[in-house]
Regions:
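N-terminal, helix-rich and Lys/Arg-enriched segments in bacterial and organellar proteins
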Residues: 9-11, 30, 38, 62-65, ...
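Acidic, low-complexity intrinsically disordered segments
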Residues: 47-93
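Short, charged/polar N-terminal "headpieces" of proteins
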Residues: 1-25
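Acidic, aromatic-enriched beta-alpha/helix-loop junctions
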Residues: 21-58
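Residue-level detector of functional hotspots within protein domains
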Residues: 2, 19, 23, 42-44, ...
């Protein structure tokens, strides 16, 4: 059993960290997520502002069974699929 947190900018996932004990392992989401964060920040006029920084939020720690590396890999896949579904719905696809 391990704990994990997800870092979001607004509703866009950016990074995941999984804790085994106190030591975390972490992974950034694929580059396309940072590209989307940057694009959205520019479009909304938040780039380079304190409001941009205020959009970064870690979730509360959640518990999940499994090996930390396996949890990390599974979460990346799940978040990619969830985000892709959200984008398709927004575009009416």
């Amino acid at each position: 059993m391990a704990n994990y947190q997800i870092l979001y900018w607004k509703d866009i996932p950016a990074q995941i960290r999984v804790f085994e004990g106190r030591k975390p392992i972490s992974r950034q989401m694929p580059k396309r997520f940072q590209v989307e964060i940057d694009r959205t920040a520019m479009e909304t006029g938040l780039a380079g502002t304190d409001d941009y920084l205020d959009q970064w939020q870690w979730t509360e720690k959640r518990e999940r069974p499994g090996d930390p590396e396996d949890i990390l890999n599974a979460l990346v896949q799940e978040l990619e699929a969830e985000y892709d579904d959200k984008v398709r719905k927004e575009k009416g696809l």
